[in-house]
Amino acid sequence: FVPHVRMMRTDYQDIGLAQLFGLPFAVLRKPIPFDTTTMNFNWQVWDTKAFSLYSRSTDRIDPQGAELAVSAVCRFLARMNVITDNVYGGYESTVLLEEELLTVKSQASGLFVPLVSSFTSVEKGQPLANIIDPLSGEIISQAVSPDVGIIFFAKDDSLVMENEILFKIVGKLHK
């Protein structure tokens, strides 16, 4: 992922507070039925501000990503006058609706070889990844960008199944 803060779209979200973390993006997403069982959703329903921070990697140790997340929390606390430390200003967060992200799915199963990573600018039609047949070593499919934008999410595993999400792209904001 591109480091970002997420909030569920309830009647209680506060995107202005989410932007105080100073991460590149603040993402709003529609809750799904499962979310009603989560603490994050219920905190919002009971008028508590609740945020989820996403760093670059979720299943590997990423010291740089962890440092960025800690800085974001410290930045938020400093901007809320909870702590008095001086913290780097961070980004002016761009607000996104999750359903507006462009999705690129695999057209075949095989070995996944990405050609771009998260936070990379891409052009319409640009190759994003190759899917390779593990038996022959030949490229059997290629994922391409559907539009101009920035890679928001990039799959990180070596194996891919057909119809699996490979990339999510922030489309060009000003057309």
Residue ranges and their predicted role:
Residues 1-175:
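Structured catalytic-domain cores with a bias toward divalent-metal coordination
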